[in-house]
A protein has these predicted regions:
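N-terminal auxiliary segments of SAM/dcSAM-dependent transferases
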Residues: 1-43
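Conserved SAM/SAH-binding beta-strand->alpha-helix loop
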Residues: 109-111
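Conserved SAM-binding strand-loop segment of SAM-dependent methyltransferases
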Residues: 123-137
Length: 201
């Protein structure tokens, strides 16, 4: 099915990628959103869990909620993290599913992927993998995941129908989605939807 999108998805992706490249390279810079350990604490992440992760995994965290507040993951589960960034939620997921589980983080920003991969190697986590890809075309097999998590990512995608279709595709029958995101309960004017700068403002 073809949908008329009011913003160019490729142009929007490039804008978003540029913003999160900055967050990866210079996480201490000033952004219009919060980042790091202080943000994780405000969002209700367990202090002991976040505190056990190295700075590299936490400093570029820019989520909007806590997908684990919905339900704790079960040992042995297979998890896909859509828009995994520097890996903060992926590493928490890895701790919850244990070495018998598996976590695949997917992100489109090379600088974020580099950080997450370096951290996974430093922590010796063989059951965590980070792949380059888009939320609209996840590099994951059909029906692979028990759980899909995401944090503050879907609102930045122009074609949300495509994102949710991909999530449905990679989830096994009976699997679940645990995500945190930004939602607007009122219609957004077309002019605002066409303004790429407003998507990341």
């Amino acid at each position: 099915m073809t949908r008329d999108l009011l913003v160019d998805p490729d142009a929007l992706r490039e804008q978003v990628r540029g913003k999160y490249r900055e967050v990866a390279v210079d996480p201490g810079a000033s952004f219009h959103f919060h980042t790091g350990r202080g943000l994780a604490a405000r969002l209700g992440y367990e202090a002991a869990v976040a505190g056990a992760l190295p700075d590299q995994a936490v400093e570029s965290f820019a989520g909007v909620g806590n997908p684990f507040s919905l339900r704790r993951l079960t040992p042995g589960e297979r998890v896909v993290d859509v828009g995994s960034g520097a890996g903060f939620d992926s590493f928490i997921a890895a701790g919850q599913v244990g070495p018998g589980g598996h976590v695949v983080g997917v992100d489109m920003t090379p600088e974020m992927l580099a950080k997450s991969r370096q951290t996974a190697a430093a922590l010796g986590l063989a059951h965590v993998q980070f792949r380059h890809g888009l939320a609209e075309s996840l590099p994951v097999d059909d029906c692979w995941a028990d759980v899909v998590i995401s944090n503050g990512v879907i609102n930045l995608c122009a074609d949300k129908h495509a994102v949710f279709a991909e999530i449905f595709r990679v989830l096994r029958p009976g699997g679940r989605l645990q995500f945190a995101d930004i939602a607007n309960g009122r219609p957004v004017p077309d002019g605002a939807l066409r303004d790429i700068d407003l998507w990341t403002a």
